[in-house]
Amino acid sequence: MFEAIIYNISVTVAGIYLFHRLQYSENRIMVFSKEYVTVLMTIVALLLSAYPVPIFNEYTLYLSFVPILFLGRYTNMFYTVLSAFIVGLVNVLIGDYTIITAMIFIVIAGIIGAIGPFLKQSDIISLQILNVIALVIFAILSLISPYYEITEVLFLIPISFVLTITSSITFVDIWHFFSLVNRYENEDKVDYLTGLGNVKEFDRHLNETARLSEENNQSLGLLLIDIDGFKDVNDMYSHKSGDAVLRQVAQLLKNYVPQQFSIYRNGGEEFSIVLYDYTLDQCVKLSESIRGGVEQSTFHLPNKEVIKLSVSIGVGYLTTDDYKSQRKVFKIADDMLHMAKNEGRNQVMFNPIVKL
């Protein structure tokens, strides 16, 4: 029995580590890919179902539902049920599952997948809640069906908690470790708070884009975006609230800016977008879309309050006939940004000076 328990824990922990290690080796970026997590946890569930825990030669406990808890938490109902279907099918064909057992397994996965993504607690606590839900379902089935016995469920309770606690702590700790490694390796390029490029990467990219625009006879545009009254957010609410606002503004910018262009956080509450081969009209329209999008959005603070914000945007633009230089386009955009601030904020300004 103890050998089987140790095997189940070891396989789960090893699978979690392998998931993070392979993903980091592949792209040097730590992100939760639902497909990647599904493949991992499906394989772990199959390995666990191959070595169930025997209890005094009377009961056999399958812990293959534990990886499904992770899918319920980190993916959605579709991936959770898909994984359970694969595990159930394989065990019906070459394992010890009956069709009824497989169907019960899939139903539990559906319930877990429907609840897991909406739990507000921490990851570790959420996984324990999902484990309790699964155990309650097993307990109910032991009372109303012949497929489970209540004694079997009583043995399952402590073993499942040992496995879920161990594996969830491992999952979160390894995630944090590789995230810190990734942050360290990319600190010269990436703004950790927003995930956008930082000011060093902005300078490099603007210089390179200016050079290529000059060589290819393309126009060069630069948007400097500043959050109006951001200091008041920090002073009235907290710096934590200010950080939350910066992250939400960064996400909003990603939604509006075409994928071929890069977005940067220059520091503080200022963002920048480098554009090329765009007309002045296109640059202004993009700026106005961003300004209007921020104005119409609501921003959620950690204390559950909701606030409204606005941005001022300065547009720097060099035509195909202008000499493209990093310093020149930045100065134009910076001057226009200050003009927008002086004109009452929540403005888009560009040269020739026109206020929208």
Swiss-Prot record:
Superkingdom of source: Bacteria
Membrane-spanning ranges: 2-22, 36-56, 77-97, 99-119, 124-144, 154-174
Gene Ontology biological process terms from the UniProt entry: cell adhesion involved in single-species biofilm formation; cell wall organization; negative regulation of bacterial-type flagellum-dependent cell motility
One Gene Ontology cellular component: plasma membrane
Subcellular location: Cell membrane
Entries under Pfam families matching the protein: 5TM-5TMR_LYT, GGDEF
The entry's keywords: Cell membrane, Membrane, Transmembrane, Transmembrane helix
Membrane topology term: Multi-pass membrane protein
UniProt domain GGDEF: residue ranges: 218-353
Major localisation: membrane
GO function terms (MF aspect): diguanylate cyclase activity; phosphorelay sensor kinase activity
UniProt-recorded name of the protein: Uncharacterized membrane protein SSP1970
